[in-house]
A protein has these predicted regions:
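Rossmann-like adenosine-cofactor binding region
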Residues: 40-123
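Hydrophobic transmembrane alpha-helix bundles
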Residues: 21-34, 69-72, 134-144, 193-198
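Glycine-rich phosphate/diphosphate-binding loop of Rossmann-like nucleotide-binding domains
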Residues: 1-71
Length: 198
């Protein structure tokens, strides 16, 4: 039984792979539309649960594998797997906290490394490998470069600042400019002063 918490890019990839190997998959997310899309795509191969419910807690505690893939861009993710959850799990259960680079979504989690990939807590294996894509540096570098290209192209034009300032989709990617912090999420999570673009 695989329970995946957070159904963004990583969560969806985990769901797909888990279904491909025949696992019983439960997806947990805060967004009902996301869960409905998954149910429409995978049908009876997936159970979907809204986050924060007793049903979600039960799915986490009864899983053989829990993947925490919670992402709130620019913010520390909420704790979605508690110490109490870990204590209630069967020994040998595996938890993978993919959100560790943003602070982790498992209570008390500490970053692991590729050479020391997990810790055991109450008989539960908890893996929170920081910079997980670093295991395949060439592939991850190519993917990152491909995804960054549109931003770099926009920086190379003469009036790049106006382009960012006036473009809804580009504006959030400009987080610091001339020493001013422009990201509300980063300002909140670090208790810093937020500035506005003028």
């Amino acid at each position: 039984k695989v329970t995946i918490i957070g159904c963004g890019e990583v969560g969806r990839a985990s769901i797909h792979q888990s279904i491909q190997i025949g696992a019983s998959v439960t997806a947990i997310d805060v967004n009902e539309n996301t869960l409905e899309d998954l149910k429409n795509k995978y049908g009876e191969n997936i159970s979907t649960i809204i986050s924060g419910t007793d049903e979600a807690v039960n799915a986490i505690r009864s899983a053989d594998l829990v993947i925490g893939a919670v992402l709130l861009p620019g913010r520390k993710p909420p704790v979605v797997v508690t110490e109490e959850d870990i204590s209630a799990m069967e020994q040998g259960t595996v938890i993978v906290d993919v959100a560790i680079d943003q602070g982790g979504c498992v209570e008390g989690v500490k970053p692991n490394t590729h050479s020391d990939p997990f810790e055991i807590r109450n008989g539960v294996i908890v893996s929170a490998i920081a910079n997980l894509p670093g295991a395949v540096p060439r592939t991850s570098s190519i993917e990152l470069s491909t995804n960054l290209q549109k931003y770099v192209d926009n920086l190379l034009i003469e009036n790049w600042f106006d382009k960012y300032k006036n473009n809804e989709s580009l504006r959030p990617s400009l987080q610091i400019h001339n020493g001013l912090l422009l990201s509300e999420e980063v300002a909140d999570s670090l208790s810093l002063t937020l500035s506005k673009l003028v």
